[in-house]
């Protein structure tokens, strides 16, 4: 009787131990491979190893939010999804449910880039969300939704700026603009040649979709103690020859805009490329 009770007790212990949902071994991660790391978008990161579990803890210090493991994850490969909210280097830390660190990896998110295809050529802009997060997020939301397609460069002034993003053929204001954003002009960036800034009215917090590219250094547009200034949020990486070509076009008056190119210059598309 004693031996049978002992056998039954051991069997019960083994049964309880087997119901824990894991293998009982410490998980190990031997490789981390990001498939996509684009600012503002969902990232997919593959974690390879052994005895991996979908209840492990993910820490990114806010650089990649709402982490979750995809249903196709296995004990050999976890598929991590999260939303990228910062640029630059960040540390991805994976812990067990008990808080034991399994792996730390340094990952890098590049600054976002937007490609603008125009009737005169292509322009690539690099944006700076660290300096102007509200402005960059606003611009990307317009670009990624296709808002800028078929809008005009409606204000062209050689030696000053080229401006776009709010009107279609005939200087008709494009519908679908979002609420105005907070002005981020006091961010350390300067209105130098080739930089990109938001256009606005005389009211500081009034920018929506319109933006301009500085054709020359326009330091008087910067923030100062006496001027609200205009928020720079990026710069032209490629295509300053296109900017110069647009700025060189002859202009005239239409619907109150005295600097409208006589030859219509259209943005055919604008989209995030990085």
Listing of model-derived features with the role each one plays in the protein:
Residues 1-8:
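Bacterial N-terminal signal peptides that target proteins for export
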Residues 19-274:
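Cyclophilin-like peptidyl-prolyl cis-trans isomerases
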């Amino acid at each position: 009787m004693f031996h049978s009770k002992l056998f039954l007790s051991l069997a019960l212990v083994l049964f309880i131990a087997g119901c824990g949902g894991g293998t009982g071994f410490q998980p190990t991660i031997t490789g981390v491979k990001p498939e996509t790391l684009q600012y503002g978008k969902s990232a997919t990161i593959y974690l390879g190893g052994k005895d991996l579990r979908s209840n492990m803890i993910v820490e990114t210090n806010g650089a990649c939010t709402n982490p979750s493991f995809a249903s196709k994850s296995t004990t050999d490969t976890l598929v991590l999804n999260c939303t990228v909210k910062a640029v630059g280097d960040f540390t991805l830390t994976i812990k067990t449910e008990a808080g034991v660190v399994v792996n730390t990896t340094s990952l890098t998110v590049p600054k976002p880039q937007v490609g603008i295809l125009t009737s005169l050529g292509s322009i690539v802009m690099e944006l700076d969300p660290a300096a102007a997060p509200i402005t960059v997020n606003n611009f990307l939301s317009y670009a990624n939704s296709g808002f800028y397609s078929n809008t005009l460069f409606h204000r062209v002034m050689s030696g000053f700026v080229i401006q776009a993003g709010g009107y279609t053929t005939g200087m008709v204001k494009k519908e679908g603009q979002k609420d105005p954003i907070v002005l981020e002009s006091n961010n350390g960036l300067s209105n130098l040649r080739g930089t990109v800034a938001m256009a606005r009215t005389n009211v500081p917090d009034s920018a929506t979709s319109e933006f301009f590219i500085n054709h020359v250094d326009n330091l008087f547009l910067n923030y100062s103690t006496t001027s609200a200034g205009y928020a720079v949020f990026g710069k032209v990486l490629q295509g300053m020859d296109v900017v110069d070509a647009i700025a060189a076009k002859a202009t005239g008056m239409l619907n109150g805009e005295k600097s409208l190119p006589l030859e219509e210059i259209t943005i055919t598309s604008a989209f995030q490329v990085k």
